[in-house]
Swiss-Prot record:
It is an enzyme of class 7 (translocase). Belongs to the complex I subunit 1 family. PROSITE patterns: COMPLEX1_ND1_1 (PS00667), COMPLEX1_ND1_2 (PS00668). HAMAP family: NDH1_NuoH (MF_01350). The keyword Cell inner membrane applies. It comes from Chromohalobacter salexigens (strain ATCC BAA-138 / DSM 3043 / CIP 106854 / NCIMB 13768 / 1H11). This is NADH-quinone oxidoreductase subunit H. It is found in: Cell inner membrane. It comes from the Bacteria. Keywords: Cell inner membrane, Cell membrane, Membrane, NAD, Quinone, Translocase, Transmembrane, Transmembrane helix, Ubiquinone. NDH-1 shuttles electrons from NADH, via FMN and iron-sulfur (Fe-S) centers, to quinones in the respiratory chain. The immediate electron acceptor for the enzyme in this species is believed to be ubiquinone. Couples the redox reaction to proton translocation (for every two electrons transferred, four hydrogen ions are translocated across the cytoplasmic membrane), and thus conserves the redox energy in a proton gradient. This subunit may bind ubiquinone. The keyword Cell membrane applies. GO terms for molecular function: NADH dehydrogenase activity; oxidoreductase activity, acting on NAD(P)H, quinone or similar compound as acceptor; quinone binding.
């Protein structure tokens, strides 16, 4: 086959990797919905979902069928175009972010020199989905939830970006693979512990997970910016939240825990194990912590996270300058 050149083979393999990684991300998010309910039941001393299939393992199938057969209703007072576009933007921006995460030395869709900046670009686009959903719904609770979510996301993205500048300075690159390679001897969680803590807090806030789920506070805003959504559109927002959990967990593994590096086990196993630990931590937070007031969340970000990231960046820069070779 004369047309099957090395360039075509490389493109085909990249497309194959993209499909596998995206399906794995969505599948992991769907599985996480059931795992979370089972773990919450265990930690809260009650039964989780245990009626569909043996030990409730088919609960995911039941939930998917329920969402598919729900009426996909659009309110007559909604802005139809933006209302339909919002969940698509939310899901697409999250899935595209997986393109720059290296799973193993040989697996990863796009080896971009600005991989970290690409992630922040996708995170910024995700804010538009929230704003479109709240504004187009024509509902005051949806609009209030969208305003909360956009302000919280934009604020904590600032701290998230600053917390990673120390990692970028130590690795000397925005390329995800080069950042992982720089952690072969020492994971960045050790020299960048304060940056890791800030990134963890910011990641929880950006994904709107408990205890930072003020944009969706059921007691105050009746489910926030997706109150008017139903059927598959609501399902895209719902699954998107869990895709965000997997994404932030994978990023923390890549940037602070050495990615696929580890002894004895294959690289893919190390990456999945580390990611699973952070996913479990996300779930544990929901069971363990109460929801603070919205003003307390914003104050914590600007009064604690921002100074901490700036101090971490200043100290990191000073240490690199002091210990760098002369003339380097």
């Amino acid at each position: 086959m004369s047309w099957w050149t090395p360039q075509v083979a490389a493109i085909a393999f990249a497309l194959f990797q993209a499909v596998v990684i995206l399906l794995a991300a969505v599948g992991a998010a769907a599985l996480l919905t059931m795992v979370e309910r089972r773990l919450l039941g265990l930690w809260q001393d009650r039964h989780g979902p245990n009626r569909v299939g043996p030990f409730g393992v088919l609960q995911i199938v039941a939930d998917m069928l329920k969402i598919v057969f729900k009426e996909d209703w659009i309110p007559p007072f909604a802005d139809r175009g933006l209302f339909v576009l919002a969940p698509a933007i939310a899901m697409a921006s999250l899935l595209l972010s997986f393109m720059v995460i290296p799973i193993t030395p040989s697996w990863g869709v796009a080896d971009l020199h600005i991989g970290l900046l690409f992630f922040f670009a996708m995170a910024g686009i995700n804010v538009y989905a929230v704003l479109f959903a709240g504004w187009s719904s024509g509902n005051k609770y949806a609009l209030l939830g969208a305003m909360r979510a956009s302000a919280q996301t934009l604020s904590y993205e600032v701290f998230m970006g600053l917390s990673l500048m120390g990692v970028v300075a130590m690795a000397g690159s925005f390329n995800m693979r080069e950042i992982v390679a720089a952690q072969e001897t020492l994971w960045f969680i050790v020299p960048q512990f304060f940056g890791f803590c800030t990134f963890l807090v910011a990641g929880i806030a950006v994904t709107h997970r408990h205890p930072f789920d003020q944009p969706e506070a059921e007691q105050e805003l009746a489910d926030g910016y997706h109150i008017e959504y139903s059927g598959m559109k609501w399902g895209m927002f719902f699954v998107g939240e869990y895709v965000g959990i997997v994404l932030v967990s994978a990023l923390m593994v890549t940037l602070f825990l050495g990615g696929w590096h580890g002894p004895w086990l294959p690289p893919i196993v190390w990456f999945l194990l580390k990611t699973a630990v952070f996913v479990g931590f996300f779930i544990l937070l929901r069971a363990a912590l109460p929801r603070p007031r919205y003003d307390a969340v914003m104050s914590f970000g600007w009064k604690v996270c921002l100074p901490l990231t700036l101090i971490n960046l200043l100290v990191t820069g000073a240490l690199i300058l002091i210990f760098s070779p002369a003339g380097g």
